[in-house]
Amino acid sequence: TGSNANLLSDELITHLTGRYNEIRLFPFSFEEYCRINNIDIVGQHTKAVGLRGHALNKYLMEGGFPETMDGAIDKTAYTKALLDTVIKKDICKRYKVRYPASLRQVADTVIDNFCQEINFENIRETYAIRSVQTVKNYVSYLNTAYLARILHKYSFKSVERQSNLKSYIID
């Protein structure tokens, strides 16, 4: 995949004339992953359940990038290269990030601590970033570039919904 730095925003629409259809492509869902690998996704017999369990473990470890499905590409190297490309070419270029190393540290922290609450102040202190707002901006950039989904905690109580955000990695 290449960089999509110029395509990240709705601003692109102002450069287009006529009609357009926005299509967002994400990595395969687990259901799609199973279909591609000919794994029964509804069967309840022992073999189907076992194969699905094995496929789920593999999916959680390797992700759902179509490019890595046939085994021809080293999954770890591919994922690292993709992350580097998005950070350097998409985020840093588009948002004119002055401290790319700090952005990378924030990205690594969000990725390493996925599904956990993001504590912006702790990240700021850990990496000696000047302000909490800078950390929030970096996390927002990760969200905009589709590296992570940043969501409010689910709760029936509005006070709990306003607490720290959680990150979910798109892989």
Task: Please tell me what each predicted stretch does.
Residues A5, S9-E117:
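Interdomain motor-coupling "hinge/lid" segment immediately C-terminal to the ATP-binding subdomain
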Residues T1-G2:
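Conserved D-loop beta-strand region of ABC ATPase nucleotide-binding domains
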Residues I73-D171:
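Accessory nucleic acid-recognition modules appended to NTPase machines
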